[in-house]
A protein has these predicted regions:
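Interfacial loop-to-helix junctions that mark the boundaries of transmembrane helices
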Residues: 12-20, 122-131, 181, 247-248, ...
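Membrane-interfacial helix-loop connectors
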Residues: 56, 62, 67-99, 113-126, ...
Length: 319
């Protein structure tokens, strides 16, 4: 959305609607997470595999959050938030556990993504979609390896938790309301700030990508594809299909351009979609570390995937 091109009244209305959706997501996520924790479903489902998970250093709450994230990623994050607040997992486990939810959640969407990508851009879309899912899988493996450090100590640590007194319903409800009271104002402010600044950041990326010096890597038509994909993947795929159809770029250059645009847009998407929710459900001390490692793991693999596709385009005739 272009803030400059609409009236201030229209912007405020759109912002308020977005804030309401954010608030509903935060409240619903925390409520569902607490219900799952208090129901005992996690312990029942994961008791058979708990010893093996313990050897890998993965807490049963985190493992359950991974499964739940396939259908409801925000509920999975709320489970981790509740376990962290209960003292069942450490800050390190909460950080990497939350990051691990992205891949299970993406798998559910990926079937639709690949179908759409192939439908719009054919072989280009297929390659692009597979790069995205492979990159997401590599990130999942990375954070799970980080999560599984010191795994041998998890068995003793879990045993000591069994004798801990369970938290009552009243205390859980009180904790949720206290968390909402402390975190919602910050979430609202941060979301509003990001909502207002993201369009300017997108335009700054777009202006940078039109630098003629970059045409040595990708033709001008390819950068047009990259700029389109900053806004939305569908726009980028459509631009790629058009550019390939006119012979302006080949498939390798189109995939490279799509990945560059995807990387440029991922930073603003993180600020717009992830951080506001994290601020709403996690304690404040956890969010900076979570954001830092999210960017480190995401941007590192995005850069590596771009480099690999660029090298491949030099030696492999994509067509």
């Amino acid at each position: 959305m272009d803030v400059v091109s609409i009236s201030s009244d229209g912007f405020i209305v759109a912002l308020l609607k977005a804030e309401l959706i954010l608030t509903a997501n935060i409240i619903a996520g925390l409520a569902v997470g607490e219900l799952i924790l208090v129901s005992g479903v996690v312990e029942y489902l994961f008791a058979p595999v708990a010893p093996r998970l313990a050897l890998w250093g993965i807490h049963d709450k985190i493992a359950s959050a991974m499964v739940i994230a396939i259908g409801a990623p925000r509920s999975g994050a709320a489970i981790i938030s509740g376990a962290y607040s209960d003292g069942e997992i450490t800050r390190r486990e909460a950080t990497y556990g939350t990051l691990s939810l992205a891949f299970p959640a993406y798998l559910r969407r990926w079937a639709g993504t690949v179908a759409m990508a192939v439908g719009i851009a054919g072989r280009t879309g297929l390659i692009f979609a597979f790069v995205l899912v492979i990159r997401s899988a590599c990130r999942f493996i990375w954070v799970v390896i980080m999560l599984s450090k010191r795994g041998v100590k998890r068995v003793a640590g879990r045993a000591s938790l069994k004798g801990r007194e369970s938290i009552g319903a009243r205390e859980r409800i009180s904790r949720v309301f206290l968390m909402l009271k402390r975190s919602l104002p910050m979430a609202w402010f941060f979301f509003a700030l990001t909502y207002a600044l993201v369009p300017f950041a997108d335009r700054a990326f777009s202006k940078y990508l039109t630098n003629p010096a970059l045409y040595k890597i990708i033709p001008a038509e390819g950068w047009a594809v990259a700029i389109s994909s900053i806004a939305h993947v569908t726009a980028g795929l459509s631009s790629a299909a058009g550019a390939i159809g006119t012979g302006s770029i080949d498939i390798g250059q189109a995939v490279l351009a799509l990945l560059v645009g995807n990387m440029a847009g991922s930073i603003t998407r993180t600020m717009r979609q992830n951080v506001g929710y994290w601020v709403g459900i996690f304690p404040r001390d956890l969010v900076p570390n979570l954001l830092r490692w999210h960017l480190i793991t995401t941007v590192t693999l995005e850069v590596l995937s771009i480099m690999l596709i660029w090298c491949a385009s030099l030696v492999i005739p994509f067509g």
